[in-house]
């Protein structure tokens, strides 16, 4: 548990770093990230681009580790993201949203697959609605 918690803390720091490659470094070479049941980002290059989308859209992006649940072989990484949508084409609106990722870990101790989830309707309301 301590090792996995340390990994989760490092993953959180990677999301806060502004460097999407640091996020991808936590995935196996052919690892995948799927957000809200969408098309998976497969491989580190694709994961870099997925992370870059959030980081570019929210230059002040901050992710906070809310908890780590271990139930069976798939740990759940619970997080809260805050940031202001001031990137290209941004609305200037502030977002605060919580969600989680269900991880399948590789034999190397990296993420082989992450299934991420958050309330997309709430996200859309926060990003696009008038204050």
Predicted regions and their residues:
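A beta-strand edge to alpha-helix "cap/lid" segment located at domain peripheries
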Residues: 3, 34, 48-131
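Short, well-ordered alpha-helical segments enriched in acidic and aromatic residues
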Residues: 17-30, 34
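Solvent-exposed, amphipathic alpha-helical segments
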Residues: 3-17
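Surface-exposed charged/polar residues within alpha-helices that form helix-capping/stabilizing sites
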Residues: 10-13, 25, 53
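Short histidine/acidic/glycine/proline-rich micro-motifs that form metal-
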Residues: 37-40
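A short alpha-helix capping/helix-coil boundary motif
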Residues: 1, 15, 29-30, 79
């Amino acid at each position: 548990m301590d090792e996995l918690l340390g990994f989760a803390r490092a993953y959180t720091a990677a999301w806060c770093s502004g460097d999407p490659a640091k996020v991808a470094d936590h995935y196996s070479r052919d690892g995948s990230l799927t957000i809200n049941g969408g098309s998976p980002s497969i491989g580190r290059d694709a994961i870099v681009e997925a992370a870059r989308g959030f980081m570019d859209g929210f230059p002040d992006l901050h992710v906070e580790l809310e908890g780590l649940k271990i139930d069976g072989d798939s740990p759940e990484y619970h997080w809260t993201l805050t940031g202001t949508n001031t990137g290209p084409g941004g609305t200037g609106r502030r977002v605060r949203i919580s969600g989680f990722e269900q991880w399948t870990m590789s034999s190397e101790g990296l993420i082989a697959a992450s299934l991420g989830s958050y309330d997309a309707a709430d996200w859309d309301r926060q990003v696009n609605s008038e204050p």
